[in-house]
């Protein structure tokens, strides 16, 4: 068979196919959001239905808030999400999964933050694939969106908003305390302060670790043009 006249051509086609597949795998990109569904329900009814579906799938409601009159943001967590978040030093940011319900042109759109995007951006270990699959099964998965081209896992791991700003592993340290409990108390006192436009939306404590993530809502107070 080695001398068959078709063998060189078949070998070349096979090699080209392998190189093409390798290139595709290397260039897999991820978008930050997933459009789950478009529905005929009103905002309040669709929000309630979305929370109910998430709870039936094993998620727990951690908090929610309306950033706009026509939108609700739902934050859920679960033992599995918290276990994934606890694998790494700064994984706590991934303990809350955000889902949005937005009313637009007589329809309501349900979207969620892409767990795979979060996995690479927050440098987590494995596990967010199953969260992605569970959310897609529970809420739907029509398309991914959010950026023009998406980002590869490698680029997400090095991402920072602009030159001179911190990367994920170089955060700003705001204060230090004698204990984790003292730090938590100080944060909650600050978020309880009236008149500054900040509200605590949720708090998630990672089991077995001194790591807590707070979700904060911010409202413009009109005190400065810099707010916008």
Language model: regions and residue ranges:
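Short, Lys/Arg-enriched N-terminal segments with co-localized hydrophobic residues
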Residues: 1-6
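Bacterial N-terminal signal peptides
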Residues: 12-21
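Sec/Tat signal peptide C-region and signal peptidase I cleavage site
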Residues: 22-26
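Terminal, regulation- and interaction-focused segments at domain boundaries
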Residues: 27-68, 143-219
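Primarily extracytoplasmic ectodomains and periplasmic/lumenal surface modules that are beta-strand-rich
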Residues: 60-61, 117-119
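Mid-chain, structured segments of secreted extracytoplasmic proteins
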Residues: 72-114
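C-terminal partner/receptor-binding element of secreted or periplasmic proteins
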Residues: 118-154
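Preference for solvent-exposed, low-hydrophobicity sequence contexts
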Residues: 220-227
């Amino acid at each position: 068979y080695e001398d068959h006249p078709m063998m060189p051509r078949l070998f070349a086609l096979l090699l080209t196919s392998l190189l093409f597949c390798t290139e595709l795998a290397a260039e897999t990109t991820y978008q930050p959001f997933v459009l789950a569904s478009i529905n005929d329900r009103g905002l309040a009814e669709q929000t309630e239905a979305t929370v109910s579906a998430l709870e039936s799938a094993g998620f727990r409601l951690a908090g929610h808030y309306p950033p706009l009159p026509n939108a609700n943001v739902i934050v859920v967590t679960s033992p599995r999400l918290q276990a994934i978040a606890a694998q790494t030093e700064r994984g706590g940011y991934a303990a809350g999964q955000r889902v949005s319900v937005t009313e637009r042109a007589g329809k309501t759109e349900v979207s969620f933050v892409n767990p795979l995007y979060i996995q690479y951006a927050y440098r987590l270990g494995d596990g967010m694939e199953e969260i992605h699959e569970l959310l897609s099964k529970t809420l739907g998965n029509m398309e991914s969106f959010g950026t023009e081209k998406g980002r590869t896992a490698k680029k997400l791991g090095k991402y920072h908003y602009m030159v001179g700003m911190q990367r994920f592993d170089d955060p700003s340290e705001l204060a230090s305390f004698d204990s984790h409990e003292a730090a938590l108390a100080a944060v909650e006192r600050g978020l309880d302060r009236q008149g500054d436009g900040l509200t605590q939306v949720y708090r998630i404590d990672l089991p077995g670790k001194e790591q807590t993530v707070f979700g904060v809502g911010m409202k413009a107070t009109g005190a400065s043009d810099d707010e916008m």
